[in-house]
Amino acid sequence: MDHLLLKTQTQTEQVMNVTNPNSIYIKGRLYFKGYKKIELHCFVDTGASLCIASKFVIPEEHWVNAERPIMVKIADGSSITISKVCKDIDLIIAREIFKIPTVYQQESGIDFIIGNNFCQLYEPFIQFTDRVIFTKNKSYPVHIAKLTRAVRVGTEGFLESMKKRSKTQQPEPVNISTNKIENPLKEIAILSEGRRLSEEKLFITQQRMQKIEELLEKVCSENPLDPNKTKQWMKASIKLSDPSKAIKVKPMKYSPMDREEFDKQIKELLDLKVIKPSKSPHMAPAFLVNNEAEKRRGKKRMVVNYKAMNKATIGDAYNLPNKDELLTLIRGKKIFSSFDCKSGFWQVLLDQESRPLTAFTCPQGHYEWNVVPFGLKQAPSIFQRHMDEAFRVFRKFCCVYVDDILVFSNNEEDHLLHVAMILQKCNQHGIILSKKKAQLFKKKINFLGLEIDEGTHKPQGHILEHINKFPDTLEDKKQLQRFLGILTYASDYIPKLAQIRKPLQAKLKENVPWKWTKEDTLYMQKVKKNLQGFPPLHHPLPEEKLIIETDASDDYWGGMLKAIKINEGTNTELICRYASGSFKAAERNYHSNDKETLAVINTIKKFSIYLTPVHFLIRTDNTHFKSFVNLNYKGDSKLGRNIRWQAWLSHYSFDVEHIKGTDNHFADFLSREFNKVNS
C-alpha cells in the first residue's frame, strides 16, 4: 500500500504555503487532442510520494481505473482511496517535456501536485530561493522560475471551455496565493534572473540544439524498416473489386544494361525485406526510369506499372490536404524546419491477403511487396491517414503533406519546443525520417514545391528549369500535356495563364489529329521567353486587409489578390496571387456587365480560402457591379443567374470600389489576350 501525505489546507494556509520560501509553485502545461493548451500552476511537494491532479484539468477520456486502488493517509490521520489514474502524461515545464508514468486523480484544492516520484525521476532536484532545477536525463540543467502568485483554474466547466472551437467562457481562476514576497532576497534574485539568463542564453541554445540533433538521430535511418527504430504501427489492406479475377500484364523486354541494374536493385529490396519471391496469380511489369531527378541522384528508379491493378482494386477516398489550406497555416511564421519520411510508403506494412496483389515481374523473376509500393493508387491516401493520426494534435505548428512534414513557429524559443515534440512523436510511433533531407531552423525553406522566404513565396527553381528545358518543337500530345501540367502547377504565379494555355490546349481535343507547325514552335518560344522568372508573391498576414481586382474581356477574365501592408504609417499594396480563365461558350454570349460580375465571382472562388470569413475590398472598372450587388431582383426567370449570383455573393463580406478603366492597368492586362499583348 502506497502512503501519501496530502496537505488539505484552508485557503489561508495555502497562501502561507505559497509565500513561504520553502514552498514551490511552478508553471506547467498540458496538451490533449481536441483541446487548447492547458496552463497550470503546479505545486512541487517532495513530501508527496505520488503525482496528483484534479479531474477538472485532465479530460475524462484520459482517466482509467487503477489496476489496484491506492489507499492514502491525509493530514488528519484518516484514509481515502484513489481509484483513477492517467498514464504516460507529458508535462511541459520551461519548454521541456517531462514524461510522468502515472498521475492519480484527487481533489486537493490544487490543480496539479508534482510528487517525489517525479523529483526522483528527474533528480538531482535542486531548490533555490527563486527557482528550482531538474537535471536527470537532460544534457543541460533545466531552470524553472518559482511563482510568486498561484491560481487554480480547474473548476466545473473549465475543460469544456478549453475544447477547440468551444464558445463556453472560461471560468475565473481561483487565487490560492498573495502577491506578497516575504523574503526580500527573492526580489534581488528575481532582478538578477534576467542577467543570468542572458549569460546562459547561448549555452542553453547550443545545448538544446544538441538535444534536437540527438532526437533527430534517434528517428533517422537509411532503412525505412530499421528494426531498431520502427514500431510497425502503420498497416494497410487492398481489396479487388472482383476477388475472382487475376490481373495479369505481360512482362517487358529488358536491355543488358537494365538487367544489370535490376540485379542490384532487387538485391537491395530483398535485403531491406520490403519484397519477397511471389507465387501470386497476379503480375505487373517493372521498368526503370531515368528522368532529371534520377540523373541528379545518379541512380535509375524502379517503377511498377500498376495501371491494370489500380483499375481492378477498390480506391481509398481519404483526402490529401489542400495545398492552399496548408499555406494559410504558416502565414506570419518566422522560422521553419522540414522533414521527409524515408521511403514513406515502405513504412506501411501490407496485410498478408494484400501482398499478392502487388506482385511484379522483372528479369530476376516474380516478386511481391511486404509494404505499400509506389504506384498503387491508394498509397498516398493510406499514408496521409496515418500521418494525420500521428500529428493532428500538433496542427497549430505542424502540417503534413503525405511524407513531407513542416514545423513552423513565431520565434526560436517556440521552435525548439515544437521541433522536439514532433521528433519525439516520430520516435514514439517509429516514423523514420531521412537525415540528409532534414532542414532545421530555417528562415527560408522549400515546401510543396515552393520557396518560402520572409513572408513571400514562389515556385522552386527546378519548375522554371523544367519549363525552359522543354523543346520548342513538341512530338506528341503526351509531351504537350506534360508541359501544360507544369504551367498549371505554377498557375498562381503566372499572369494570363488561361490565355497562354488556350492555343495549346486546343491541340489536345480528341477529334483533332496531332500536328505541330512552325507557328506553334514560334508560340512555344514566346511562352518560354515570357516565363524567365517567377516573382516572389506576398503571403498575406491574418490582420492585413485584402483586395481583389478583376476585369473581363470578350473571351477571358482576370483577377488578382492583394494585401495592404502597413509599415511605419505607410500603406503598401502587395500582390499575393494571380488568377485568370477563359469564358465557356455560353458565357461568351453574356452581356459585358455579366462577364464583369462573373470575373468577380470566379476570382473570389479562386481565393476563397483567404476571403472567408474576413471583410475585403473588390475593385473593378465596371460601373454596373456596385449597383448590381444592391439591386433587388424579384423572381424574373430571365434574370435567374443574377439572382443566383446575388445569393452566392451574399455569403461574403465586402465593399466595392469603382476605379476608372484607365487606372485598372493590371487586371486589364490579365484579361487581355496573350497573343495581342505579345505580338
UniProtKB/Swiss-Prot annotation:
Bilayer-spanning residue ranges: none
Organism in which the protein naturally occurs: Cauliflower mosaic virus (strain BBC)
Example of a GO biological process term: proteolysis
Protein name, UniProt field: Enzymatic polyprotein
UniProt record similarity statement: Belongs to the caulimoviridae enzymatic polyprotein family.
Entry text on domains: The polymerase/reverse transcriptase (RT) and ribonuclease H (RH) domains are structured in five subdomains: finger, palm, thumb, connection and RNase H. Within the palm subdomain, the 'primer grip' region is thought to be involved in the positioning of the primer terminus for accommodating the incoming nucleotide. The RH domain stabilizes the association of RT with primer-template.
Pfam families the UniProt entry points to: Peptidase_A3 (PF02160), RT_RNaseH (PF17917), RVT_1 (PF00078)
Keywords: Aspartyl protease, Endonuclease, Hydrolase, Nuclease, Nucleotidyltransferase, Protease, RNA-directed DNA polymerase, Transferase
Organism domain of life: Viruses
